[in-house]
Amino acid sequence: EPYIVYIDTVNRQIPQHHKLAGLKVKTSNLCSEITLPTGVDNEGNQRTAVCCLSSLNLDTYDQWKDDPQFVEDVMRFLDNVMTDFINRAPDEFAHAKYSAMRERSVGLGVMGLHSYFQQKNIPFGSVMSKVWNKKIFQNIQEKVDEASKTLADERGSCPDAAEYGMKERFSNKTAIAPTASISIICGGSSPGIEPIAANSYTHKTLSGSFNVRNKYLKKILQKYNKDTDEVWSGITTNQGSVSHLNFLTANEKDTF
């Protein structure tokens, strides 16, 4: 699938201290979540972008959304990973180490957005999903911003920010990665912020081929006593859709 990057929008949204330094984003990584300055910077040094990511599982959002320490702990983890890279990476990675040291850019993202909507019986793209989308990401952003300032007090601002008198441990703080593989490891949550492709499909791995079924749809089918191989076979045949299941309500069809 293609990844599309609107580079003008990216450069309008870069951190203020990078704007003041005259830094520009010229490209992204393949998956497009890493949008950091590369090439020669205002100091005449070469920068190579560094990818330091973690993703929160929105499938379990209700378990951690009100925990004031949760997001901060994840940001501490990313900061520790960044420090370890700077200290241990070989000299051949000099440009990447320099970039990491100056920016301390990390990327806290998510997976399981569609899974969260489905467990709440909220159709993807509905008014309610838009309300929850804004609420979720506003909550995460506020905690990420707070963590950056807390860590700046404890450990110092990153050099790029400190140069302009700004209290930020991290230049970039968030990034939405595809999470195609790790979402499977995390119990089959939906990938990134993407909708689930199908409710039933064959997943091919090095270990073999496996039938994957939507765990939240399974609960709905159990409610109707329809959690049978025959029903799941029909869903698979119908390209993972439930549009042909007449016993489902209109909202349930929209949700799944």
Regions found by a protein language model. Give the residues of each.
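Long, C-terminal-biased catalytic regions of enzyme "large/alpha" subunits
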Residues: 1-256
